[in-house]
Amino acid sequence: MATKEKLQCLKDFHKDILKPSPGKSPGTRPEDEAEGKPPQREKWSSKIDFVLSVAGGFVGLGNVWRFPYLCYKNGGGAFLIPYFIFLFGGGLPVFFLEVIIGQYTSEGGITCWEKICPLFSGIGYASIVIVSLLNIYYVIILAWATYYLFQSFQSELPWAHCNHSWNTPQCMEDTMRKNKSLWITLSTKNFTSPVTEFWERNVLSLSSGIDDPGSLKWDLALCLLLVWLVCFFCIWKGVKSTGKVVYFTATFPFAMLLVLLVRGLTLPGAGAGIKFYLYPDISRLEDPQVWIDAGTQIFFSYAICLGAMTSLGSYNKYKYNSYRDCMLLGCLNSGTSFVSGFAIFSILGFMAQEQGVDIADVAESGPGLAFIAYPKAVTMMPLPTFWSILFFIMLLLLGLDSQFVEVEGQVTSLVDLYPSFLRKGFRREIFIAFMCSISYLLGLSMVTEGGMYVFQLFDYYAASGVCLLWVAFFECFVIAWIYGSDNLYDGIEDMIGYRPGPWMKYSWAVVTPVLCVGCFIFSLVKYVPLTYNKVYVYPTWAIGLGWSLALSSMMCVPLVMVIRLCQTEGPFLVRLKYLLTPREPNRWAVEREGATPYSSRLAVNGALMKPTHIIVETMM
């Protein structure tokens, strides 16, 4: 067949098979048509609903408490070099890919891959396993923030002094530390600060280890319940309600971050903190860990490989120009991370000056920044109660809208597996309540006296960078080398009216897979077993459990491949060709409704469906 005819054949196939019919949503259900009720998949009320939902989904805690610390730790301004390489070579291409395939197929994170390439539908299942585990422990941070917020409504912040029942004789107030020589003498005696004791002895009541869970912390359990109730009532009506809630939850944190930035820049010592944040150390680029941190931060901060962005994209109208908005949202996300560093390190610079210590001694990441370093800083400011309330409201809202999006992505992906059952009546709402309840009950293990050890185990393994890189590699591989980047570009052109520049398809084909593989290998080579505070060493069984959590998502891809091949009849190569071929929407819709599995029938109207790209063509 001539090359020109072959390309035309592929375009015709692509148009006939995956392009939705006029007046129908992609994935139209035949039984709805028979009843005279064309399916109306829920759509965003306006473009701004989608933009704010995505912004709220990926502008979260990681932008405020992880990026600034990584920037300082990995060479300051020099860290921006690997960061931008991973941003343009991996983060933005995968982010846009997930949004656009959701919009193109009008399916969630699992069923979109069933349409595109049934053999690799395990990609969707892997994403859902990751986001399900993430939903269990991410919300614990919000429970802690809620507890701190309630404790902030006092004339004197409870972590400012050492005169409470949970304090020990080793507690030393920060006023004593202003005398640097005295502090150097006392620090050799293992004195602790009131804010550290409040965190470890009051909030966590930290036990001796993960094998000593202790009793349930009822105050944290109630805070966790409150957060889950807020989450449920904000998403239970679908994107119509979520799209309105994010008008507040996605915008108000930016206003508060701006206030904190202005306040931080006006504090004494702010200049030293910012210099410490951005001072470039080019020699750090020789360390592979710097590149690993840059890659994993990009994937975390863009909330990709979780199925959430695909689910949000599936509610877009077919002709919506998501390419333009995805690029703008990418700028917003990375810009927020960068500006957050000024807000955080200006305050840490002030804090270091007040204590008479180096900034490196007060710089923290993750929970250490949010619940130790920053609460300590506000006790040194005028109006500490006001700044504490402001900070924890911002932290809570940043986390809440991310949680909304992650749970919505999880629910959408699972509901799309059984739409005729779960979309009837109030079944979707009941299903959301069930998922929230299960996640809450599992999360109770993290609000015990030993819960912090469980939380760290989930955070280190369950949704680790290794898992996200694994999923991202297969997403790009399937689109570029099986379905075909040009075929997807045809669909994009049909949706937005033009073809994006070649940067995206080159990234999907080469750049992103190479970055993912390199970062994945170095992550395994540089792997260090988990510890808590660099002191407590996790037992072997806990490390094994952590790797089981990581593998539970990664194994979905090969496991589903084997299951699909076993379920399909015929010679091996024939089965392989069929499973590498995009599914015809209406026939696939019948299968997902419980009819005779179409995967057991190898022909469509007596002939195999035409292949789409290189790998399938070489087999034929």
Curated annotation (Swiss-Prot):
Activity regulation information from UniProt? Taurine transport activity is inhibited by hypotaurine and beta-alanine.
Positions bearing carbohydrate: 163, 179, 190
Q: What GO molecular-function term can you cite, just one?
A: taurine:sodium symporter activity
Q: Which domain of life is it from?
A: Eukaryota
**Which InterPro entries did the record assign?**
Na/ntran_symport (IPR000175), Na/ntran_symport_taurine (IPR002434), SNS_sf (IPR037272)
Region annotated Disordered sits at 1-42
The Basic and acidic residues compositionally biased stretches are: 1-18, 29-42
Outcome reported for the amino acid change (mutating residue 215 to A): No effect on taurine uptake; no effect on phosphorylation by PKC
Database matches in Pfam families: SNF
Modification(s) after translation: Taurine transport activity is down-regulated upon Ser-322 phosphorylation by PKC.
UniProt keyword terms in alphabetical order: Cell membrane, Glycoprotein, Membrane, Neurotransmitter transport, Phosphoprotein, Symport, Transmembrane, Transmembrane helix, Transport
What protein name is recorded for this chain? Sodium- and chloride-dependent taurine transporter
Gene behind this protein: SLC6A6
